[in-house]
């Protein structure tokens, strides 16, 4: 993805504290908001999990361990406390969060709402949260051979904003077991990393990032340090009401690593060093609008962003198992009871509607993009990180590096919009300036709800209903619906299915498969490999 810089304007006592971090403060008790989500099985039954979310350490007050004196104010460190990276980590503490009042974060049952601007005793901009398995560990998702489904409402996200849901290869405990300088851990949202190898993090690997710190020239709250935090990133969803993309970003290592200076590459390094790091900062992306399908996604279009909808992402392996090699990433939607196939590319040289190795190579060639995706392992490398387990990130942000034009406008701005790959959405090239977006759209927000995870074909047919009611028990189950309306971008067919027919895009065959082997009306059971056939 492009730069992930979720910025905020001055928190009363401190701003944008650590992201892999030091000691624990005692001024505010940390209480994680609850969030239910479901795991599903191949027969369509789903079990509700009583989870919780934690805000990233970058949003927290960080202060001296011996007082309420800020370690970091504005976009500068207090050099009397933070004389070097190691000393700073020992001298500074993260404190608890007040989620709704300070950050505009609320939950209700399975629904998480993130407000863009929250005006409390100070002004907060955006947020980044992680799903937890317990009070001290992040939930790890192993995506291979599975599908991940959620409902989203982007109707209140204008040009320049990004409601992003994605996975990164963070440590489950936030780094406490590996780095003795990190006492806060996942409970306080530490350990962040992504494919941009972000250098705006205040703490990495249990040490501060104050050495070589340079305050930002266009943001009063941020800066760049000598170190960055790198790891593989699977952007399942980056979107506003105008455009969306899903993108795979592999890295050379399946685990988080620390990098130095401009050799980190990515958004935070000098332009000539963008591709000098160990990760792919561009990734292999699928944006229907960028691929010429300009009538698929947006207000009043096939996927109508005026209303909530369900996003389904499938991670297909060569043998249909969770231990196979990643070969394809598929997308479909459910809205108003209709299953909607992903908007296909309109370019003859870039075929299909999913991410495959062939798609990535042909897209890079057509758009003239440097193919660093293959350099860092391609889909197979992305799959290796998935096999290890990845942490779910839920966020809302604006973009001080590129005004989000890479998502929803013409980018680069000095290229003709008629050049393949330049047009990414209908937003003006003058849009997305953070100061303008924050002033004109302070009430923007995104909601994520009804998160489900399970074998391919197990989640979405029961996940299209709206609502966020809380389950009474972590062991309660819901049963997959047995009828739906089916829709592609060119053809619509309706009819009831039964337990003897697989749903649209569901599994319908393969070695060891015991479910239905026929498809609902309008769909054909299509052979993918010896272990997997799908209704297409």
Curated annotation (Swiss-Prot):
Disulfide bonds join 508-525, 519-535. Glycans are attached at residues 351, 414. One of its GO terms (cellular component) is extracellular region. PROSITE patterns: CBM1_1, CBM1_2. It catalyses: Hydrolysis of (1->4)-beta-D-glucosidic linkages in cellulose and cellotetraose, releasing cellobiose from the non-reducing ends of the chains. Residues 464-499 are annotated as: Disordered. Residues 1-21 form the signal peptide. Residues 459-500 are annotated as: Ser/Thr-rich linker. It comes from the Eukaryota. It is found in: Secreted. Belongs to the glycosyl hydrolase 7 (cellulase C) family. This is 1,4-beta-D-glucan cellobiohydrolase B. It comes from Aspergillus niger.
């Amino acid at each position: 993805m492009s730069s992930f810089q979720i910025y905020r304007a001055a928190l009363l006592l401190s701003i944008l504290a650590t992201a892999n971090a030091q000691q624990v403060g005692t001024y505010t008790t940390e209480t994680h908001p609850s969030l239910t989500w479901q795991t599903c099985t191949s027969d369509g039954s789903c079990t509700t999990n009583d989870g919780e979310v934690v805000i990233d350490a970058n949003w927290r007050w960080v202060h001296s361990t011996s007082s309420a004196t800020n370690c970091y104010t504005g976009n500068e460190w207090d050099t009397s406390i933070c004389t070097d990276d190691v000393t700073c980590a020992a001298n500074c503490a993260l404190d608890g969060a007040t989620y709704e009042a300070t950050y505009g974060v609320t939950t209700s049952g399975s629904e998480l709402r993130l407000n863009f601007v929250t005006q409390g005793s100070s002004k907060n901009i955006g947020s980044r949260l992680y799903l937890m398995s317990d009070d001290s560990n992040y939930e790890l998702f192993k995506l291979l051979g599975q599908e991940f489904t959620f409902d989203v409402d982007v109707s209140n996200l204008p040009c320049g904003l990004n409601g992003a849901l994605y996975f990164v290869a963070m440590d489950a405990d936030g780094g406490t077991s590996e780095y003795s300088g990190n006492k806060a851990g996942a409970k306080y949202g530490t350990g962040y990393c992504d494919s941009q190898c972000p250098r705006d993090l205040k703490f990495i690997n249990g040490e501060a990032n104050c050495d070589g710190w340079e305050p930002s020239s266009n943001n009063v709250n941020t800066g760049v340090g000598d170190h960055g935090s790198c790891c593989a990133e699977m952007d399942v969803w980056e979107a506003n009401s105008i455009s969306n993309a899903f993108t795979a970003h592999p890295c050379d290592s399946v685990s988080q690593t620390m990098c130095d200076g401009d050799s980190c590459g990515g958004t935070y390094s000098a332009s000539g060093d963008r591709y000098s790091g160990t990760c792919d900062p561009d990734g292999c992306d699928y944006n229907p609008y960028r691929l010429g399908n300009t009538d698929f996604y947006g207000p009043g279009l096939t996927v109508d962003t005026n209303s909530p909808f369900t996003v389904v992402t499938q991670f297909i392996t060569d043998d249909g198992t969770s231990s196979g090699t990643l070969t394809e990433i598929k997308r479909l939607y459910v809205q108003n009871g209709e299953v909607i196939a992903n908007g296909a590319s309109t370019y003859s040289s870039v075929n299909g509607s999913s991410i495959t190795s062939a798609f990535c190579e042909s897209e890079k060639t057509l758009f003239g993009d440097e193919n660093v995706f293959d350099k860092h392992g391609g889909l197979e490398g992305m799959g290796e990180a998935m096999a290890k387990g990845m942490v779910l990130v839920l966020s809302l942000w604006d973009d001080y590096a590129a005004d989000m034009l890479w998502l929803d406008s013409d980018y680069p701005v000095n290229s003709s919009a008629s050049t393949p790959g330049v047009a990414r959405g209908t937003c003006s090239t003058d849009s997305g300036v953070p100061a303008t977006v924050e002033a004109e759209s302070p009430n923007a927000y995104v909601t994520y709800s009804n998160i489900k995870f399970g074998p391919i074909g197990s989640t979405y047919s029961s996940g299209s209903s709206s609502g966020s009611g809380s389950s009474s028990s972590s062991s309660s189950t819901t049963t997959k619906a047995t009828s739906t309306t089916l829709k592609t971008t060119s053809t619509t067919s309706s009819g009831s299915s039964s337990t003897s027919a697989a749903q649209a895009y569901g599994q319908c065959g393969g070695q060891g498969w015991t479910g239905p082997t026929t498809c609902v009306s309008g769909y054909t059971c299509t052979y993918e490999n010896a272990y997997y056939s799908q209704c297409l």
